[in-house]
């Protein structure tokens, strides 16, 4: 399975490079977050072994358990929604929270980060599709939340994040383009640099690269459609740490 992961990663990087060339971009400016939700620590270990340093998890407690099992390594991203009451554990677990979508959550994270003496990287999640089922704030509200975050200690605002609509990859282009335009407008209005556009998943990442993505969130494109059991050793193998 680690060999399959390496082969899939090579194919993904080829697609990223091709999309970057089409847009006149440097492919080295495009990072990959390996999404390991529901997969065991062995999958994270394999990702780190092939050079995927950025690990994405949807649930705070699941990520904390994996970090504890692995004993360190990687840069961990929260890519799922965060409730205010999980702020303390999130600050203890993640390096970058990509899904801040309210001042309430931002303040809870800032308070905890201040308490432990660290600066937590955060991005603002924007609902760029106007789909009421998706998380994220309205594009018109992103500037105000950015201003709030910049006024808080303990947080380092890095950019904006969005999730494209379901359907063909090309359907995501307007959302991705909107996010880039919004990021540029917020930078200009507030006089800050927001280097990250966190957008693009397994079904639409080439389009995201063409539209300026700097952090892709890839699960199936790297790990396939296998369930968590595919990463567990058989009876004759050693434990998961072997």
Feature names for model-found ranges:
Residues 1-203, 209-211, 220-225, 234, ...:
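Conserved alpha/beta-domain cores
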Residues 214-215:
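Divalent-metal-activated hydrolytic enzyme cores
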């Amino acid at each position: 399975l680690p060999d399959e992961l390496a082969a899939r990663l090579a194919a993904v990087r080829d697609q990223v490079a091709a999309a970057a060339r089409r847009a006149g971009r440097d492919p080295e400016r495009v990072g990959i977050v390996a999404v390991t939700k529901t997969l065991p620590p062995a999958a994270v270990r394999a990702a780190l072994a092939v050079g995927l340093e950025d690990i994405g998890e949807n649930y705070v407690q699941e990520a904390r358990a994996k970090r504890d099992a692995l004993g360190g390594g990687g840069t961990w991203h929260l890519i799922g929604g965060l409730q205010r009451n999980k702020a303390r554990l999130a600050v203890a677990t993640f390096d970058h929270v990509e899904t801040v979508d309210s001042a309430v959550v931002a303040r809870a994270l800032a308070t905890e980060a201040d308490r432990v003496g660290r600066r937590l990287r955060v991005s603002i999640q924007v609902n760029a599709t106007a789909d009421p089922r998706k998380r994220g704030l309205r594009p018109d509200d992103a500037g105000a939340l950015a201003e709030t975050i910049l006024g808080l200690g303990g947080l380092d605002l890095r950019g904006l994040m969005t999730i494209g609509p379901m359907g063909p990859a090309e359907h995501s282009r307007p959302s991705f383009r909107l996010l880039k335009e919004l990021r540029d407008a917020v930078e200009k209005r507030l006089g800050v640099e927001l280097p990250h556009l966190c957008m693009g998943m397994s079904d639409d990442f080439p389009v995201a690269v063409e539209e300026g993505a700097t952090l892709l969130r890839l699960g199936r494109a790297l790990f396939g459609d296998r369930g968590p059991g595919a990463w567990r050793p058989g009876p004759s193998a050693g434990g998961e740490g072997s």
